[in-house]
Amino acid sequence: MRFPILVLGALLTAPVTAQDIGAPDPLFRDNAVLDVTITGPLTTLVRERPKDDYVDGVLAYTDADGNGVELDLEIRARGHFRHANCDIPPVLLNLKRKQTPGTLFENQNKLKLVVQCDRSNRLEQAVLKEYLAYRILNAVTDKSFRVRLLSVTYINTEKQNDSEPRYAFLIEHKNRLAERFGLEDLEIEKTSVKSLDGAQLNLTSIFNFLVGNTDFSPVAGRPDDECCHNYVLFGKNETPQWAVPYDFDQSGFVDAPYAEANPR
């Protein structure tokens, strides 16, 4: 496995800077690659791609003291485009709250795991570049989703396999981001530009421009979806709404082989 550009190494070791208000959870305070093992019926997960039904699994890692930690979890497929078009779908990890206190995964429940679309080197690079896109945004605004890069060994309980570690990354849950800033996740149909915090909107719009991303809307969702397309809205009372972007796999910066620019 190799990194796409040298700057990623610096970002991996740089500490996350944050004030007491807005400090990320333990999982996202460290940028070192976390080695984990995920065990479960992976054949079912990949072939059937259940979005409504979970399969049981186990996540294991070694903590800072050298102790092995195992956490029971449920796993299901998720996503839209990548769910339909990738050999391996992105997944949602559902941890058991009673097992996480005192572990690196304290305060975590449901976590999005971004995996390689297929096993090619090019798609491995795409995962790393998308992770890097999140980290770049973290560097310019605390109001962004934190991420943690993993080296994952997958153990399939339905088939004997020799699995080499593969890169993936976890994304902070929107409820945890909201709690960091005393805001609420707004589940609304649509919004307007004038309702959004102007500085945050300008910053994230410039960011999307710089990474060559056209797959987003901060004011509306897809047909039949709540607001917004690849943005999450946060707010409280009469304060301006904060629009926070995610999903950068369609950007020119990531350069995934399946990416297509929005013709509009």
Which residues are covered by each model-predicted region?
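N-terminal regions of proteins, emphasizing targeting and processing segments when present
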Residues: 9-11
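Phosphate/dinucleotide-binding and metal-coordinating scaffold of catalytic cores
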Residues: 18-264
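N-terminal signal peptide c-region/cleavage motif recognized by signal peptidases
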Residues: 13-15
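Sec-dependent signal peptide recognition
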Residues: 2-7
